[in-house]
Amino acid sequence: MEPAAIIAPQRARGEGRLVAKAEGGRTRIAELYQEGCAKIRLPKTFDASMEAVLINSSGGVTGGDRLSWEFRAGKGTKLTLTTQACEKVYKAAAGTAEIATRISVAAGAHVDWLPQETILFDRSALSRSLEVDLAADASFLAVEAVLIGRKAMGEEVRAGLFRDNWRIRSGGRLIHAENLALAGDIAALASRRAVLDGAAAFATLVYAAPDCESQLSKLRLALAGHALSGVSHYDVGGRDKIVARVAAADGFALRKILIPLISHLRKDASVPKVWTL
């Protein structure tokens, strides 16, 4: 009698890479690579910048899925990176989903990292990382938002795992690092005053640019009426950065806070159009 075959569960794999260069007064493609469920689309822009929309064609991630993204903004380029939709993290039968993102920004270049929200479902498991290398005079804006279930759908995350690790360097020197870990009954953790005080949506904003200090008062004014939010300015070895933490009751309320902040730091440019489709 032959042993029964063991069929491994199907898992999503994806790898995407985009390299941008400055040519003819515009930001253009130098290299584009996509494999598996990772897709990159480049909508038409009407200025010198480039916008890239990232797509996970598997429709979400679950235990054992692996996605890898790499972006390199060449000297003098301006690149906006966003996602087609919210990244949904579904119940994991086994294993942990992994998403790794690497971004390098050359001299005089600017990158906006503006993915739409990550939605955690009950019994989901995700570990993700963001590695950013900036030239000494490059600038960078990053916003990552997370929803702990969808409040309008009555969802709660009573068991799960979410790890989020950031490392941002400027001129080879570490200027920002954070390790977030939510494990177990995430809804109960979020209800604690020292964590989210009952909020089900939260975001981190990091801005590294020469004009950080001049932006601080306007950002504080924008957040003045939001008790669960705050913004600070830091000088790390001569490199300025702004860090804002925002929390809200749900995803809709979170967007109402975030969009004006993002627009202001993008010099009054709107958020990527896919955010409003």
From Swiss-Prot:
Localization in the cell: Cytoplasm
Signal peptide positions (record): none
Molecular-function GO terms, alphabetical: nickel cation binding
Predominant location category: cytoplasm
One GO cellular component term: cytoplasm
Keyword terms: Chaperone, Cytoplasm, Nickel insertion
HAMAP family named in the record: UreD (MF_01384)
Described function: Required for maturation of urease via the functional incorporation of the urease nickel metallocenter.
Family, as annotated: Belongs to the UreD family.
Subunit note: UreD, UreF and UreG form a complex that acts as a GTP-hydrolysis-dependent molecular chaperone, activating the urease apoprotein by helping to assemble the nickel containing metallocenter of UreC. The UreE protein probably delivers the nickel.
Protein's UniProt name: Urease accessory protein UreD
UniProt source species: Rhizobium meliloti (strain 1021)
Gene for this chain: ureD
